[in-house]
């Protein structure tokens, strides 16, 4: 029976550091790129076109202010990361609602959903993905951080036209029914 929904912002926190440091031309160790590439938040999106080496190459090119050449997914990942560095204030406004996000109420709301009796814990991970809006992998819902749209008026966030918490609830329902 579903008892917990855990929020994982590890990849977003790491990338917030990276975007700030890279924009200020600080030195970022190459080992950082390898560590980020190993995070489950990113590795869940790996396939024959996009892998850990894609992540490392894109982030290294940004840090070193080099031109980047890659396939469509790699270029999308590189472009999204460049976009985050253009306006760090906007980037922070995307991250702030996540830091305040409390998903505890969804546990009771999802009781009775088909499949909720088979999984004890769901992990909701926010990740800087290339093009996928979200990925369901086992008991993990991985949401593309780049798809978050902050709202200046009420400090809520949206993905598409859906308020973030409602979006997460709908995707967890999908996860539970798989």
Feature locations, PLM:
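Auxiliary, metal-adjacent structural segments of Zn-dependent hydrolase domains
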Residues: 80-150
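N-terminal low-structure segments adjacent to metalloprotease catalytic domains
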Residues: 1-89, 94-95
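Active-site recognition of the HExxH zinc-binding catalytic motif
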Residues: 143-144, 149-178
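Charge-rich, solvent-exposed alpha-helical interaction surfaces
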Residues: 58-61, 97, 109, 167, ...
């Amino acid at each position: 029976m579903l008892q917990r929904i855990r929020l994982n912002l590890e990849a977003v926190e790491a990338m917030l550091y990276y975007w700030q440091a890279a924009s200020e031309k600080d030195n970022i160790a190459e080992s950082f790129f390898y560590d980020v590439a190993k995070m489950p938040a990113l590795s869940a999106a790996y396939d024959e076109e996009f892998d850990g080496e894609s992540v490392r190459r894109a982030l290294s090119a940004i840090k070193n202010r080099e031109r980047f050449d890659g396939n469509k997914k790699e270029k999308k990942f590189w472009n999204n990361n460049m976009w985050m560095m253009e306006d760090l204030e906007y980037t922070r406004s995307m991250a702030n609602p996540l830091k305040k996000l409390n998903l505890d109420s969804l546990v009771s709301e999802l009781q009775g959903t088909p499949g909720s009796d088979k999984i004890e814990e769901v992990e909701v991970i926010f990740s800087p993905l290339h093009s996928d809006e979200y990925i369901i992998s086992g008991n993990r819902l991985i949401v593309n951080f780049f798809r978050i749209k902050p709202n200046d008026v009420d400090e809520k966030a949206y993905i598409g036209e859906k308020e973030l918490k409602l979006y997460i609830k709908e995707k967890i329902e999908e996860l539970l029914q798989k």
